[in-house]
Amino acid sequence: MCHSFSRARIHQETDLKGSIQNNNFVLVHGAWHGGWVWRPVVDELIGRGHRVIAPTMTGLGERHHLLASVTSLDVNIADIVNVIEAEELNDVVLVGHSYGGLVASGVADRIPHTLRTLVFLDSLLVQSGQCAFDILPASVVDERMASVRASGQSLAMPVNGLKGTGIPDDHPRAGWVHRRLTPHPLATYTTPLMLEHPLGNGLPCTYVHCANPSYDTLAPVREHIRSQHPGWGWESIDTGHDAMVLAPALLADLLERLAAAS
């Protein structure tokens, strides 16, 4: 039951402590973000003796210069698969945030033998053959496509400030997040997720709802998961969408607990 790289940052700790069960965490960021956004949680988990890798996917963050028409969901899935294989990781706790949930789904389909459990953190999820725009509300899709047209370029969805992150403008890390956001590759939202196995590929899966405030854009996803995947674990966390920024210690506690239970 389921209860950043290239300057892509690879964070690890070799001085592991005491009785703590040392876990391998791979943290996959969401749209407009990069591996950098996990820094507060990376620091928490490394401080507790775990190994943590938070890659930045192609076309985003410090890899935004690699944005191209071919920067698709499949490319981002390959980014994470290649990190796990290059680091020769096994027994991985794979965490996908927001758009990163689509990526984590593809990774689990391709290399399940390297994974212990999947954690979908306020994730965007679809069924095989669907793309991200297929499950989002039509008003959201229209708004995002209008922003692409207004930007005068066709490869990426422009940054829209902190909208959707749940981060208040007066939060101590608001400026840090805002200045590091980068346009998000449009093709990642129009590329269908093609799976050879059922979503989750038989691995223990947990969906974590960031409930305060709840990100209404993902309401259709949450409804689908609760109705179609009753065997998955379900957790709520008392913070907003960018939980790794808003409540890193609380999120680290939850990830440790889910890792220990799997």
Language model segments and positions:
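Conserved loop-alpha-helix segment in the C-terminal half of the alpha/beta-hydrolase fold
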Residues: 211-238, 242-245, 257-258
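Flexible "cap/lid" loop of the alpha/beta hydrolase fold
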Residues: 109, 115, 119-158, 188-189, ...
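Active-site nucleophile elbow and catalytic-triad environment of alpha/beta-hydrolase enzymes
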Residues: 180-198
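Conserved HGGG/HGGXW glycine-rich cap/lid loop of the alpha/beta-hydrolase fold
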Residues: 23-64
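Short beta-strand immediately N-terminal to the catalytic nucleophile in serine-hydrolase-like folds
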Residues: 94-96, 121
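Active-site loop/oxyanion-hole signature of alpha/beta-hydrolase fold enzymes
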Residues: 51, 57-93, 109-110, 133-137
